[in-house]
Amino acid sequence: GNSVKVKWFNEPTNLHTIWDSKMIDSQNLSYTEYANFILTGIDEVVLDKWKRDDVLTYSYESRDYRNQCYDYEGDNLSYNYIFKNKSLLEKRLLQGGLRLAGTLNRIFK
């Protein structure tokens, strides 16, 4: 994504930055508020499974989602891109946080 040059609401950037910060910042919530929102209604069984997943599982999932991330027309991304990818963004943020927590818990147990 770093080498994929695009615009975000007419501002030059790259696709990696859009996923790392621009879509998150566009929610206009604090990080705590956004984390609480993402956690709302998630099944505990799913959360526990994600905590136990290994790095290989995560990398395969990322590969499978790659086409969705690159599915856009033109080079000026905005509201439509958010609409198409917000649920995936939130899922990956949640999975990343849980998997990091699970890994750290296993290391320091």
Residue ranges of predicted features:
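An amphipathic alpha-helical core segment
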Residues: 5-91
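Active-site beta-strand/loop microenvironment that shapes enzyme catalytic pockets
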Residues: 1-3
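Sec-exported extracytoplasmic/periplasmic mature domains
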Residues: 24, 105-109
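Divalent metal-coordination and catalytic microenvironments
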Residues: 100
